[in-house]
C-alpha cells in the first residue's frame, strides 16, 4: 500500500475526488491574495504619500518573507503532512488580511505583506507537493495554472472593486478573508497525501535542497526562469503606474487589465500546451516571450493601451509555457519525499528574480522615468532569454556526448 493510499483510505470518497480541485482552488486563493494589492498601490501612494521606491519595497518584502518561509519550512510538510502545514498557512494569511484591513500607513502594509509572504511560502510548497503526490503529471500542470489564475483573479477582481465598489481598501481583503476561513474548515475533509516521517527539526535548518538528479536541469533552466519571474515582478509592482503615466489612463480597471492579461494568457497557454513535451513548450515560450516584450516596449513608446495589452498577451503566453516547462522538467526528477524541498528551491530562485529586479526598477523609475525603465528592463530580460537558449543547447550537447 502506498503512502497516498494508506492516508487517503480513512477519508471519504467525496474528499478523495475533490482533493485536486480543493488544492488547486486554495493555491489560487493564496496567489490571488498576493496580487490583490497591485491595483491598490496607486491609491495607497496617494493616501499615504509615498514614492514609487516604497511601492516596490512593499511589493518585495512579500517575496523576501516568502523566501524565508521556503528556506525554513519549505520541506516541513514532508515530515508533518500536507494538511497541517496548509491549515496553519491559511491562519497566517487570515492575519495578513486583518492587517491590511487595519492599515493606515505604509508600515501596516509592510507588516501585512511580510505575514502574507511567510504564509504563501509555506502553502506553496505544501500544496504543490500535495498535487504532485496525487498525480505527478496533472499535478505539475496544476502547479503551473493555479498560481497564474489566482494572480489574474486577484489583479482583475481588485481593479473592478476599486472602480465600481465602495471601500476599495477594505472590500477585497474582507472577501479574501471569508474564502480563507472556508478553506481552513474544508481542509480537514480532504485526504492527506503523505505519511509523517522523522527529521522535522533537521528540516527547519535553512538550506536549499536540490536532489542531485535535478541539478543539471534546474541550472540549464535558470536564465529563462529568472527572465520569466522578473517580468512577472515588474508587472505586479509597477505596471499599473506605468500604464497611468505613459498612456494617461487613470481608470484602475485599465491598469488591472494589463496586469491580468499577463497571467490570464499564461494560464490559458499552460492549459492548451499541457500535453506537449517540455522541449516543445520551451521553444514556443522563448519565441513568444521575445516577441511579446518587443511589442510591450512599442506599446509604451506610442502610449497605446491596445498595443500594450497585445504585447502582454503574447509575453504571457511565453511566460506560462516557460513556467510549465520548468516545473514539468524538474519535479518528476524528485522522489516523493524530496518534492517539497525541490519545489522550495525552485521558488527561492523564482522569487529572488520576482523581487530584486522590481526593486531596482523602482529606483530607476524614480531616477529616469517609467518609459526608460521599461526599455532597460526589456533589454535585460531579452539578454537572459538569449543566455538561456545557449545554456539549454549546451546542456543538450552534454547529454548527447554522455550517451
Question: Which residues make up each language-model segment?
Answer:
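Helix-breaking motifs and short loop linkers at transmembrane-helix boundaries and internal kinks
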Residues: 49, 81, 102-107, 166, ...
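Conserved MFS/SLC helix-loop-helix module at the cytosolic interface between two early adjacent transmembrane helices
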Residues: 67-106
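Cytoplasmic helix-loop-helix junction between adjacent transmembrane helices
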Residues: 112-147
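Helix-loop-helix hairpin linking two adjacent transmembrane segments in secondary transporters
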Residues: 138, 142-188
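Symmetry-related core transmembrane helices of the 12-TM Major Facilitator Superfamily/SLC fold
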Residues: 171-187, 374-391
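Transmembrane alpha-helices of Major Facilitator/SLC transporters
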Residues: 254-278, 292
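C-terminal transmembrane helical hairpin of 12-TM major facilitator-type secondary transporters
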Residues: 280-326
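A late C-terminal transmembrane helix in Major Facilitator Superfamily
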Residues: 319, 327-378, 388
Amino acid at each position: 500500500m502506498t503512502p497516498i493510499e494508506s492516508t487517503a483510505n480513512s477519508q471519504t470518497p467525496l474528499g478523495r475526488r475533490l482533493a485536486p480541485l480543493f488544492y488547486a482552488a486554495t493555491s489560487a486563493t493564496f496567489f490571488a491574495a498576493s496580487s490583490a494589492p497591485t491595483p491598490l498601490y496607486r491609491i495607497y501612494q496617494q493616501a499615504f504619500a509615498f514614492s514609487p521606491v516604497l511601492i516596490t519595497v512593499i511589493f518585495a518584502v512579500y517575496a523576501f518573507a516568502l523566501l524565508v518561509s521556503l528556506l525554513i519550512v519549505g520541506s516541513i510538510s514532508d515530515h508533518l503532512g500536507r494538511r497541517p502545514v496548509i491549515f496553519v498557512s491559511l491562519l497566517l494569511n487570515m492575519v495578513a488580511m486583518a492587517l491590511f484591513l487595519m492599515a493606515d500607513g505604509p508600515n501596516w502594509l509592510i507588516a501585512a505583506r511580510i505575514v502574507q509572504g511567510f504564509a504563501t511560502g509555506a502553502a506553496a510548497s505544501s500544496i504543490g507537493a500535495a498535487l504532485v503526490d496525487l498525480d505527478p503529471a496533472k499535478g505539475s500542470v496544476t502547479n503551473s495554472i493555479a498560481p497564474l489564475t489566482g494572480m489574474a483573479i486577484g489583479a482583475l477582481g481588485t481593479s473592478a472593486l476599486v472602480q465600481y465598489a465602495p471601500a476599495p481598501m477594505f472590500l477585497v481583503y474582507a472577501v479574501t478573508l471569508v474564502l480563507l476561513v472556508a478553506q481552513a474548515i474544508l481542509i480537514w475533509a480532504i485526504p492527506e497525501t503523505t505519511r509523517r516521517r522523522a527529521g522535522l527539526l533537521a528540516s527547519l535548518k535553512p538550506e536549499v535542497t536540490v536532489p542531485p538528479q535535478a541539478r543539471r536541469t534546474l541550472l540549464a533552466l535558470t536564465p529563462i526562469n529568472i527572465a520569466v519571474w522578473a517580468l512577472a515582478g515588474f508587472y505586479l509592482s509597477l505596471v499599473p503606474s506605468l500604464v497611468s503615466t505613459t498612456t494617461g489612463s487613470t481608470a484602475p480597471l485599465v491598469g488591472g487589465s494589463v496586469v491580468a492579461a499577463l497571467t490570464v494568457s499564461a494560464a490559458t497557454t499552460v492549459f492548451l500546451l499541457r500535453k506537449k513535451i517540455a522541449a516543445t513548450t520551451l521553444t514556443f515560450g522563448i519565441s513568444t516571450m521575445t516577441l511579446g516584450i518587443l511589442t510591450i516596449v512599442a506599446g509604451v513608446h506610442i502610449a497605446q493601451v491596445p498595443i500594450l495589452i497585445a504585447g502582454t498577451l503574447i509575453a504571457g503566453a511565453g511566460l506560462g509555457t516557460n513556467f510549465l516547462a520548468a516545473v514539468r522538467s524538474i519535479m518528476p526528477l524528485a522522489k516523493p519525499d524530496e518534492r517539497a524541498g525541490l519545489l522550495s528551491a525552485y521558488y527561492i530562485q523564482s522569487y529572488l528574480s520576482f523581487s530584486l529586479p522590481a526593486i531596482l526598477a523602482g529606483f530607476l523609475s524614480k531616477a529616469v522615468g517609467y518609459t526608460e525603465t521599461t526599455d532597460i528592463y526589456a533589454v535585460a530580460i531579452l539578454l537572459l532569454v538569449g543566455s538561456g537558449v545557449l545554456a539549454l543547447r549546451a546542456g543538450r550537447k552534454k547529454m548527447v556526448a554522455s550517451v
